[in-house]
């Protein structure tokens, strides 16, 4: 069963996420494992990135090589500045730099308000490191806190998809993202395991957004106003 789930995961993310389940994650009470995936791959639309040969500082204690380019849009609110750069398929990457240095939460950035801002500008210069990372998160506690307690309890009702009385025992999500001067690959797989119930003429306005310290990012579908991927980058190691 575990090998079957992982084979599906590998196939549906084009090998970007070859595995999500370990054998010890399933037991004799495991009845169902529901999985879904999201896969994204695209090159950049225009204005390619230039890659530096020299390393520069990221934050206070790290160094990395940076890419620079001209962005397509600029956003700003009281909490952050951001650049948007288009992919070749009507989606875009949005790099968000908090105005306050140090750690931050995504809620503090008011991303919805940020994307609705219309600051005055003529051009935006953008700078960021290449990205290559993978994260794994167990989402059960988060989902319970936002109101989905019943699916984890004996009150859960999955009679439409299961013959036995079952409840959700775990919700595991793995995400992988690779971004460089050529484009972006990103994938996410979520596995929900269920158990049987027993347990004007003026000078041009040039804006700069340099992601040289912890920042946030979106892969955004502006046509449908949907965020496909969202994350924070706190380290480049």
Show the residue positions of the predicted features.
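Non-catalytic, conformational "gating/processing" segments within enzyme and secreted inhibitor domains
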Residues: 1-99, 117-202
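Short beta-strands and strand-coil junctions in structured, solvent-facing domains, enriched
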Residues: 16, 102-103, 227
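Extended hydrophobic
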Residues: 34, 81-96, 201-237
């Amino acid at each position: 069963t575990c090998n079957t789930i992982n084979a599906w995961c590998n196939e549906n993310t084009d090998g970007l996420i070859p595995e999500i389940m370990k054998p010890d994650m399933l037991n004799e009470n495991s009845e169902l494992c529901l999985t879904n995936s999201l896969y994204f791959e695209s090159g950049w639309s225009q204005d390619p990135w230039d890659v530096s040969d020299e390393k520069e500082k990221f934050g206070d204690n790290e160094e990395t090589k940076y890419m620079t380019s001209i962005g397509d849009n600029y956003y700003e609110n009281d909490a952050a500045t951001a650049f948007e750069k288009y992919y070749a398929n009507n989606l875009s990457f949005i790099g968000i730099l908090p105005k306050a240095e140090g750690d931050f939460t995504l809620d503090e950035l008011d991303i919805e308000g940020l994307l609705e801002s219309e600051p005055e500008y003529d051009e935006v210069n953008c700078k960021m490191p290449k990205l290559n990372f993978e994260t794994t998160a167990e989402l059960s506690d988060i989902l319970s806190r936002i109101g989905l307690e019943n699916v984890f309890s004996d009150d859960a009702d999955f009679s439409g998809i299961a013959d036995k009385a079952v409840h959700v025992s775990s919700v595991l999500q793995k995400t992988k993202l690779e971004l460089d001067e050529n484009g972006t690959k990103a994938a996410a797989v979520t596995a929900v395991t269920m158990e049987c119930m027993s347990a004007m003429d003026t000078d041009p306005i040039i804006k700069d957004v340099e992601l040289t310290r912890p920042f946030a990012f979106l892969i955004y579908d502006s046509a449908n106003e949907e965020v496909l991927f969202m994350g924070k980058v706190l380290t480049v190691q």
